[in-house]
Amino acid sequence: MTKYLVVEIQTWDTGAIQTPTNAFDTQASAESKYHDILSKAAVSQLPKHAAVLMTNDGYVMETKCYEHEAAATQS
């Protein structure tokens, strides 16, 4: 049975990286978590904040990364 994984990738200004991962039985539940992470990542204070939605077979369904550091240097 296919499982759906949501990986949050938090890159800190110190260079440290955290990757909290959640597993779900349904695609709908996984997509809900994925979009919840993205809504927080959009306003995050981290230099880079990303999320990946994938299956346990390694198929990547969606991914998005917010790079706040780059946006701040363009101003």
Role assignments for model-derived ranges:
Residues 31, 37-75:
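Short, mixed-charge low-complexity intrinsically disordered segments
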Residues 16-32:
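A short, exposed loop/beta-hairpin motif centered on an aromatic-Gly-Thr core
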Residues 1-20, 48:
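Short aromatic-glycine-(Arg/Gly/Cys) micro-motifs in beta-strand/loop hairpins
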